[in-house]
Amino acid sequence: MIMMSPLYALTKQCVIDTAYRLAVPTQHCAIYTVACRILFLSVGFMTIVKLCGFKMDTSSFIASIEKDNLMDCLISLVEMRDRLRLCNDFPILNYGVNILELLIGKRLNKINNLKNCYVIRELITINISKEWVGKQALKVGLHCFLNLSQADSRHVKYLLSDKESLNKMNFSRYYVPKVVTDLYLDLIGVLYVNTGYNIDLVEKFIFDKLEFLVYDGEEGFKSPQVEYNDICTVNNLKPIIKYNRWHTDGSIVIECGDVIGKGINKTKKKFAINDAKAEFVKNFKAKNKNNE
């Protein structure tokens, strides 16, 4: 399990601080400060650190953040990106390098080219409110952060084994990589601040994006949700999902022929559906085994 690093703790505090600044803007908060903090702190390097447990000196990066120095922050990111490129031990780092490329520009290969970085150029030339700039940076950051389709969950070995914490996260009864729970909680916060949507809608959106990273921890294991999709595709099945009793007793039923799956969760429809899929998969496998 990955321990919470000083960098991660600082990140969470800065994200909270930035959200406060967006809500209560002051003249002392420069445009680049808001955009820089949201873009880099809610998206960037700490994601890589948490995903792979990669040890790296981040003191210069932290110092540049504390001083609100965008140029030094970019220099540190360039240096860290170059170091990550040299490490082949963690396949997930390829994904991390891609994140940094998105943040600092693909053509940014030398420190003396920093002034050409699109982030700096936009912040220097744009003349609009800091709230708008901050929110746009957050949207870009969330887009990069949530684009996790290339991240291979098989390389994420850090599982959340604390049953109490696992149940609190409502990820059904399956192991959850520690990084997923961290991302889940953080992203709910920043997305809620940015959109003002109902918190339940925000939770559902985040869960849908991160669900594929939930797995049992055994090599080659597929979550029941993934297995459900595979079974339906391979066997050309079109199960019927019945929601009509969810508002009364929290139950959702999935039917396909004589195979039925039922899930119950009175507070979260998504989790009731997932449990119904899990039971459907179990019953479908049992039926096929009996027919062999």
Swiss-Prot record:
Region (RNA-binding): 219-292
Membrane topology: Single-pass membrane protein
Protein name according to UniProt: RNA-binding P34 protein
GO cellular component assignments: host cell endoplasmic reticulum membrane; membrane
Species whose genome carries this gene: Lettuce infectious yellows virus (isolate United States/92) (LIYV)
Role summary: Acts as a ssRNA-binding protein that may be involved in targeting RNA2 to replication sites or facilitating RNA2 replication.
Molecular function terms, GO-annotated: RNA binding
Keyword match RNA-binding: yes
Compartments where located: Host endoplasmic reticulum membrane
Membrane-crossing residue ranges in chain numbering: 29-46
Keywords: Host endoplasmic reticulum, Host membrane, Membrane, RNA-binding, Transmembrane, Transmembrane helix
